[in-house]
From Swiss-Prot:
Pfam family, one: Ribosomal_L19
Keyword Ribosomal protein in annotation: yes
Any one GO biological process: translation
Organism domain of life: Bacteria
InterPro entries per record: Ribosomal_bL19 (IPR001857), Ribosomal_bL19_CS (IPR018257), Ribosomal_bL19_sf (IPR038657), Translation_prot_SH3-like_sf (IPR008991)
PANTHER family in alphabetical order: LARGE RIBOSOMAL SUBUNIT PROTEIN BL19M (PTHR15680:SF9), RIBOSOMAL PROTEIN L19 (PTHR15680)
Family of the protein in this entry: Belongs to the bacterial ribosomal protein bL19 family.
GO molecular function: structural constituent of ribosome
Record keywords: Ribonucleoprotein, Ribosomal protein
GO annotations of cellular component type: cytosolic large ribosomal subunit
Annotated source species: Francisella tularensis subsp. tularensis (strain WY96-3418)
Protein name according to UniProt: Large ribosomal subunit protein bL19
Function: This protein is located at the 30S-50S ribosomal subunit interface and may play a role in the structure and function of the aminoacyl-tRNA binding site.
Length: 115
């Protein structure tokens, strides 16, 4: 069991402005990138490969294809570096973790869209 003070601090740091999304959904993650003394927003667009719900330590992995190479990036859900998350499409998948998508390309890698 966690300390009451730790629970209070963690609860104050949880973000409530992010939308609800699930594995398979196509999302765009806009995050702050610092280059030298400048800051800018960079978008990472792909589908959610997995989602880990652990309170303040929650994380999700987004996968995209870039020049024919699969790129995966894991984000901390409640990170202050995330500016916004935009859900592009909802997906209808039967698994919680879509690791099998790593080996698929082309038409085999399509995900059924939820209507």
């Amino acid at each position: 069991m966690k300390n009451k003070f730790v629970e209070l601090v963690e609860k104050s740091q949880l973000r409530t402005d992010l939308p609800e999304f699930n594995p398979g959904d196509s999302i765009t993650v806009n995050l702050w990138i610092k280059e030298g003394d400048k800051q800018r927003i960079q978008a990472f667009k792909g589908f959610v490969l997995r989602k880990r719900n652990r309170g303040l330590h929650s994380a999700f992995t987004v996968r995209k294809m870039s020049s024919g190479v699969g790129v995966e990036r894991t984000f901390q859900t409640h990170s202050p570096l995330i500016d916004s998350i935009i859900v592009e499409k909802r997906a209808d998948v039967r698994r919680a973790k879509l690791y099998y998508m790593r080996g698929l390309t082309g038409k085999a890698a399509r995900i059924k869209e939820k209507v």
